UniProtKB/Swiss-Prot annotation:
One of its GO terms (cellular component) is plasma membrane. Pfam families: GMC_oxred_C, GMC_oxred_N. FAD binds at residues 4-33. Its EC number is 1.1.99.1, 1.2.1.8. Belongs to the GMC oxidoreductase family. It catalyses: choline + A = betaine aldehyde + AH2; betaine aldehyde + NAD(+) + H2O = glycine betaine + NADH + 2 H(+). It comes from the Bacteria. Keywords: Cell membrane, FAD, Flavoprotein, Membrane, NAD, Oxidoreductase. This is Oxygen-dependent choline dehydrogenase. Pathway: Amine and polyamine biosynthesis; betaine biosynthesis via choline pathway; betaine aldehyde from choline (cytochrome c reductase route): step 1/1. Involved in the biosynthesis of the osmoprotectant glycine betaine. Catalyzes the oxidation of choline to betaine aldehyde and betaine aldehyde to glycine betaine at the same rate. It comes from Escherichia coli O6:H1 (strain CFT073 / ATCC 700928 / UPEC).
Amino acid sequence: MQFDYIIIGAGSAGNVLATRLTEDPNTTVLLLEAGGPDYRFDFRTQMPAALAFPLQGKRYNWAYETEPEPFMNNRRMECGRGKGLGGSSLINGMCYIRGNALDLDNWAQEPSLENWSYLDCLPYYRKAETRDVGENDYHGGDGPVSVTTSKPGVNPLFEAMIEAGMQAGYPRTDDLNGYQQEGFGPMDRTVTPHGRRASTARGYLDQAKSRPNLTIRTHAMTDHIIFDGKRAVGVEWLEGDSTIPTRAAANKEVLLCAGAIASPQILQRSGVGNAELLAEFDIPLVHELPGVGENLQDHLEMYLQYECKEPVSLYPALQWWNQPRIGAEWLFGGTGVGASNHFEAGGFIRSREEFAWPNIQYHFLPVAINYNGSNAVKEHGFQCHVGSMRSPSRGHVRIKSRDPHQHPGILFNYMSHEQDWQEFRDAIRITREIMHQPALDQYRGREISPGVECQTDEQLDEFVRNHAETAFHPCGTCKMGYDEMAVVDGEGRVHGLEGLRVVDASIMPQIITGNLNATTIMIGEKIADMIRGKEALPRSTAGYFVANGMPVRAKK
């Protein structure tokens, strides 16, 4: 089998590349996905409110686990990643958050990454998006990904939480992806107008999968990339339960889009990475790149949970006797409780003036429950998800075997810097202040977690060690740049090799201020044009907010 391009991983970026490259009918593409199809009849992935279900099994989730995290009481922590057409866009929380403009401007400060500035990237965010309330300078109107904005009157807790943030002195913003990210406001979501999850399989592959020049193979576990000298010339994979490898040749390029955990793992198995690590497993060295698998970053978050005095939370939706009605309303009408992920309000703030742009993110949820659906509080409640955005802590991904079915060693080194602890203490104390504003007096009952007795630095730190969780945003393990630890250049091409690119969240040099899916899609769109030799979309002229030393909040 021969193709022009072989794409490894049908996730948020891989599906973008498969769709854009096959717009040219003379270009042939093979798309390999280790998981299965995105079954449209499976409510677990298609119903927005069911977002916790895919994380509870292994059909759609790689269900990775970290090594014992040394600063988190040696907990082995969850590291869920999507498996199946859509990748992590098939199982994520559907929050459409692009990050802060200054995140990308910060990337562009690196030599030869100048064209990754916010205004250079904004046209590609817009290209990917169809926003339900229409396009403007910041949002697209005819892209593959459906984005739904929160509408007034969904739940009184959303508006009360935004109002409480304003009463605490923080700004309101009507668009967290628009002119000003900083502040509290409604959150955009990747949900279709018919109340279905808008994964990249739905948005991109649905329009491309019938093209004769696109071949999609599911249940295809990539073993390694095949090299001829320093040039990638093909891929070898295992189909289903077979132990007999299948091969295909790439006439032009191999495009690795397997995500921040699997992309470095595949490179290492293919002979690209740290020479000492590869020698441990007798893997012939193709090219030494010490940065492969290093620079691992993530967002850590915790929940502050409160009793709700008014019966307006989603607690009734957790009762089994209400779920058939909710399911029917969603299935036949695309409406109701099932049609939302219920992360419809949130915000970004600076916890201290030393931060030039927001370093703390909030998601508000009108029910008290863990992200993966466990430990639901058995009463009306609500919670704030809060966490820091740009931790200085760095971890790694390293193979533990040549066997493609064996998970790699993953260590995030969460909370390994003093800055981490200061930010989380600040986050808890600021959140409590917001929760005690008059806007929430009508609804706020007792603090369920961490509980009012948890006050001192030592008590707060212990709460974080025991209860903070991943926000499922790993990135950075094949970072873009030109220093000695960089893996790819500004076009995703792997340093020192030919015919091989990495295109996914692993190439982010530094984690962004917000959820990763929207920016991963943007990366796919931008590099697709580079691969095709197309001129970049014209740079945007839209304005954007920069604090420039403004106080973090208004004085009361």
